[in-house]
Amino acid sequence: MAYDRAADFLEPIDFAEHLDKIELYLGQVCHIAGISKMQLDYWTNKAQIPTKGKKQRIYDIDALETVMLIKQAKDKGLNLGAAIDAARRFRELR
């Protein structure tokens, strides 16, 4: 019964409030997006996706979203340039 009373003090956590604090390494972004490290390196340079870090690239949640939008567009048949443009336009419209 003590456990039930303690649980009454807890409130749901709104993760949206904390997304800007998330930092992901290259391998994590690749795993989440389903792409290779070579693809991510190339896309990061080609699309000028901002990263932090000097020795290792660190991506924020916005960069991850951009990568996933590019992947989605490529999966639908767009070439890389068109996929990058589509991802940019999509993000601008939101």
Protein language model regions, located:
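Key DNA-contact positions within bacterial/archaeal DNA-binding proteins
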Residues: 38
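Arg/Lys-rich, alpha-helical DNA-contact motif
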Residues: 1-31, 45-50, 61-94
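Short, Lys/Arg-rich nucleic-acid/phosphate-binding segment
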Residues: 53-58
